[in-house]
Amino acid sequence: MSEIVSINITNHQLVLDPPFPASWDPQPRTKFPVTIVRVRDSDGREGVGSGDVMYGFADYARYFIGQPAGDLDRHAAVLANIDFHAGRPWPLDLALWDLAGKTAGKPVWEMLG
């Protein structure tokens, strides 16, 4: 099984034009912060995920680098702990699933059942 060799995280501002009037916010949003995560394995495959902004993840990358890329149960347990302490690491979860799907040659929806 391949191992995770790198995690690349970039943060972006998605411009909303026209502004988006979210039902929970009285001010229309003109931009939305997002994160794109790229996870690369030792076989050169890359999984990509995106979602809510992920600040401060660098301290936690060591819990994934060198680990089996396809061990999704393990990764989910680590992500649940990170979520409790640091918040919103779910773009990484999506990238890990994307990588697992590419490794298996299946779409993620099929792997989920």
List the predicted regions and their residue ranges:
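Structured beta-strand/loop patches that form or line metal/cofactor-binding pockets in enzymes
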Residues: 1-47
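Metal- or metallocofactor-binding catalytic centers and their adjacent structured scaffolds
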Residues: 6, 38-107
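Short, intrinsically disordered, charge-balanced linker/junction segments flanking boundaries
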Residues: 109-113
